[in-house]
Design a protein with these regions (language model features):
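N-terminal segments that cap or nucleate solenoid repeat domains
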Residues: 11-49
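Glycine-rich hexapeptide-repeat left-handed beta-helix
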Residues: 2-24, 58, 62-66, 72-74, ...
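Ser/Thr-centric signal marking residues that sit
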Residues: 36, 68, 91
Length: 182
């Protein structure tokens, strides 16, 4: 049962309290005006949630780490006993789906990728665009995963792991452009 109504001010995201839980948005984070945050959502400093994103946490929490970017059209959802934890410096590409999973620090989830309940994507890993990480699969750190179902193709180089971090830093800088525009 919803216990509050959405906040729908112009140029403000939709924030919905559910079961007494209101999303917690760190003052240094940024949420696009048409994003929707529901329930037990927590955003750390410098996290960014872009346009048309839904973070829906009525059963378990969604924690988004510092400097992480959740790009346009992403859906993040939980199930009972399956929270979502996204580490620091993570990039979640456009239209990806994170469902009841853990994404460790510095990972990159490609556009349109799907990560299902209980899956863990290791630190510094890249999940290719359109890949599917099935329920319960654990991806080792620094792995490149591609395919449906996703399979580890190889270990990432130091340069590739750094490129993932650099991508997250680019989005931290883009936030200022969008804050000024709105």
């Amino acid at each position: 049962m919803l216990t509050g109504s959405p906040v729908t001010k112009e140029h403000e995201p939709v924030i919905i309290t559910i079961r007494g839980h209101t999303p917690e948005v760190h003052p240094e984070s940024w949420v696009a005006p048409n994003a929707t945050l529901i329930g037990r959502v927590r955003l750390a400093a410098r996290a960014s949630v872009w346009y048309a994103v839904t973070l829906r946490a009525e059963a378990e929490p969604i924690d988004i780490g510092a400097g992480t970017n959740i790009q346009d059209g992403v859906t993040v959802h939980v199930d009972p006993e399956y929270p979502v934890r996204v580490g620091a410096g993570v990039t979640v590409g456009h239209n990806a789906v994170l469902h009841g999973c853990t994404i460790e620090d510095g990972a990159l989830i490609g556009m349109g990728a799907i990560v299902l309940n209980g899956a863990v994507v290791g630190a510094g890993s890249t999940v290719a665009a359109g890949a599917l990480i099935p329920q319960g699969v654990v991806v080792p750190p620094r792995s490149l995963v591609a395919g449906v179902p996703g399979r580890v193709r190889r270990e990432l180089s130091d340069a590739e792991v750094m490129a993932n971090r650099d991508n997250a830093a680019v989005y931290e800088r883009l936030v200022e452009l969008h804050r000024e525009a709105i």
